[in-house]
């Protein structure tokens, strides 16, 4: 089975770099790009066409719902998983309406996060 190709979208540099390191030791996940904004996500995804975008909800510029729409316009086959420290039900509803297939919190254990990414790719 080939690795799930993932783009990370997270404005917190430390958290984004930590995710890169953690995913880097997992053979089933390949981080193909890592960016800090939703605007960058849409641009990167249009050229890389990842399987999954793991995207923060609260970022400068486009929020998670707006960035999800932009990514899915550029790459309709890509699956988006929203990742946030805390999201309201309204934000979850917004990102789901925009096309995200899942929404998880940043305190989720890493194995569960990997499972969510794999499930999203298989959807």
Task: Identify the role of each PLM range.
Residues 13-33:
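Two-component/phosphorelay signaling modules centered on CheY-like receiver
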Residues 10:
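Conserved acidic carboxylate
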Residues 87-104, 108, 115:
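Alpha4 helix (beta4-alpha4-beta5 surface) of REC/receiver domains from two-component response regulators
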Residues 56, 84:
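Active-site residues of response regulator receiver
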Residues 37-40, 60-66:
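Acidic catalytic/metal-coordinating carboxylates
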Residues 34, 53, 80, 103-104:
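Two-component signal transduction core modules
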Residues 48-54:
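Active-site beta3 strand of CheY-like receiver
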Residues 65-76:
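Short amphipathic alpha-helix used as the core "switch/output" element in two-component signaling
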């Amino acid at each position: 089975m080939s690795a799930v190709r993932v783009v990370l979208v997270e404005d917190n540099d430390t958290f984004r770099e930590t995710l890169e390191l953690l995913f880097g030791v997992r053979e089933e996940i390949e981080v193909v790009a890592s960016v800090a904004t939703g605007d960058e996500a849409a641009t990167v995804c249009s050229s890389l066409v990842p399987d999954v975008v793991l995207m923060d909800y609260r970022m400068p510029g486009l929020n998670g719902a707006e960035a999800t729409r932009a990514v899915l316009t550029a790459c309709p086959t890509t699956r988006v998983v929203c990742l946030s420290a805390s999201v309201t039900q309204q934000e979850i509803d917004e990102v789901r309406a925009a096309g995200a297939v899942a929404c998880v919190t940043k305190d989720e254990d890493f194995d569960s996060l990997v499972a969510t990414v794999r499930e999203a790719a298989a959807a």
